[in-house]
Regions:
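Rossmann-like dinucleotide/phosphate-binding beta-alpha-beta segment
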Residues: 139-210
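A short, aliphatic-rich alpha-helical micro-motif
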Residues: 43-46, 65-68, 145, 198-202
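Short, well-ordered alpha-helix to beta-strand connector turns
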Residues: 19, 49-50, 68-71, 148, ...
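N-terminal glycine-/charge-rich "phosphate-binding" loop or analogous flexible N-terminal tail
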Residues: 1-49, 173-175
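Short gly/ser/thr-rich secondary-structure transition/capping motifs
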Residues: 31-37, 54-56, 130-137, 187-194
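Phosphate/diphosphate ligand-binding glycine-rich loop within oxidoreductases
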Residues: 48-127
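Short, polar loop motifs at secondary-structure junctions
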Residues: 4-5, 57, 178-183
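Structural motif corresponding to alpha-helix initiation and N-cap regions
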Residues: 5-8, 35-40, 58-62, 83, ...
Length: 210
């Protein structure tokens, strides 16, 4: 992946702070450039690697995996593995690891800001005030978020955090569509109506995709 020497040193210091000395693992680290590397750059930079630590979305393709027979593990620093060819990894005997829930709270913090910004048109008023203008409302009065229905497409960690912010914070009604959510999770959220995709898009005033 893409990581700088400074970031690598920060990682080493973080490990050391909790009693883990990376040097005792007898490892060597190859650092790629900041931009997202190409297939060729990954192959050339990881010729002797046994583990690839992937930040960003580097293309860990079949070509890459077949060109690096020493690689045994690919660790993705994030939840998604969409840039990794999982079928090729399985065929090559490479174990792929990810970090479920990575930045879920941070994502759930940003989503309400964007939603409220759209409802209240804050970006427009911010620009105008910075220009020295103090415009009165030129559009319909914004709706009260407490009277709206928030539809969550995906009810993983980020979706559940967002539910807490809107339902517990504003009293907003929340519905969700997620074919993979377990019954155990559903039982923990009796206030959420789990609906079909068609019902989600017809009943929601706001839709947030997770």
């Amino acid at each position: 992946g893409s990581v700088s020497e400074i970031e690598l040193e920060q990682v080493k210091q973080a490990y050391a702070a909790v009693g883990i000395e990376m040097e005792v693992m007898d490892y060597k680290v190859a650092v790629t450039q900041q931009k997202e590397p190409t297939e060729e750059e990954i192959i050339n930079g990881c010729k002797n690697a046994e583990i690839i630590l992937a930040t960003g979305n580097p293309p860990i393709t079949r070509k890459v995996l077949e060109s690096l027979p020493k690689v045994k593990f690919v660790q993705r620093f994030g939840a998604g593995v969409n840039s990794i060819d999982l079928d090729a990894a399985a065929e090559c005997g490479v174990i792929v690891l990810n970090l479920p829930g990575f930045c879920a709270k941070e994502l759930a913090d940003v989503a309400p800001a964007m939603i409220m910004g759209l409802i209240r048109n804050t970006a427009y008023y911010d620009r105008e005030v910075r220009k020295g203008n103090w415009p009165k409302c030129k559009y319909l009065l914004p709706p009260d978020v407490r009277e709206l229905t928030l539809g969550l497409y995906g009810f993983g960690l980020a979706g559940r955090y967002l539910h807490d912010i809107f339902h517990k914070g504003f009293g907003t009604k929340v519905i969700a569509c997620d074919p993979y959510v377990s019954n155990a999770i559903k039982l923990q959220y009796p206030d959420v109506d789990f609906v079909s995709f068609e019902e989600l898009i017809t009943q929601s005033d706001i839709i947030s995709i997770h």
